[in-house]
Amino acid sequence: MYVVDRGEGAPLILLHGFGVDHRLLLPLDPALAAAGEWRRLYFDLPGHGRSPMGGVASAEDLAEAVEAEIETRVGTEPFAIIGNSFGGMIARRIAHHRRGQVLGLAAIAPVMVAEHAKRRVPERTVIARDLRALAELGDVAGSYEEMAVVQTRENADAFLAHAHPGLTAADPAALERLARRYTLDAEPEIASPAPFTQPTLFVIGRQDHVVGYEDAWDRIEHYPRATFAVVDSAGHNLHLDQPGLVAALISEWLSRVRRSRSSKDRFA
C-alpha cells in the first residue's frame, strides 16, 4: 500500500475519501507540521492513487487491509487517526477496533450512513461563484462544480492541485467493485457500543450535499470527548472551502490529544 511518510513523533494516520487519493489531505499538512511531534502517514487506499486494489472487494476488506498496513508500519505504538468522507467511515471502524491503541479520532465530512438514499442531506447550494475561474478550468469544470460550494479562483486552484490528480489516478474498475459493497458489516458505534472516550473531532460542511451533518450528530452521545463543528460556506471538500477554520480545528484537536496522552502517562 502506498503511504507518504512525513515528520517524526507519534504516528498520525490520514485516510482520504472515495475516488481520490492522499493528495486531497495534503492541505492539512502545514497545520499538522506546525503542531509538532507527529509522524504523518498519508495513505492511498486500495484501488486509489498508487495503491493496487489487490484482493480487496468490499469496504470491510479495505478496512482490514488498512488496519494491517498500520500494524506493519507502527506496530503496537499508539496512534491518532484522521479520516475524510469514506476514509472517515474507515477511520471510525479502526478507532473502535483498536481502542486501546488509538489516541484520538478526527472525522472530516465523514460517511456515517453508507447507503446514499438513506442519508439526510441539504439541497445543493453554491455560496460564491467566479465565472472567470470556472471558464479557465475547461473540461475539469464539471467535476469541480459537483462539489465546490465556494467557487473562487483560490478554491479552484486547490481542487486542481489536491483533488483532481486523485480523481484521474483512481482505478475505475476497482472503484466500481468497491461501490457494490460500500458498507461495513456493522456501523462502528453499534459493533462497539461503549462510548469512545478519546479526544474526537467531527467537522462537517453546512452545505455538504453528499453526507450532510445530521447523521453525524445522531452519534454525538457516543463520543463524550467530541468537538462537533458544522461549518458555514463549506461543502463536502470543506477543508478546501474553509481551509483556515478546518486547520484551526484540527490543531486544537491535536492539542487535546497531546494533553490527554500526557495526563494518562502521568497517572499510569
Regions found by a protein language model. Give the residues of each.
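Conserved alpha/beta-hydrolase catalytic His-Asp/Glu region
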Residues: 116-118, 136-194
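Conserved alpha/beta-hydrolase "acid-adjacent" motif
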Residues: 209-215
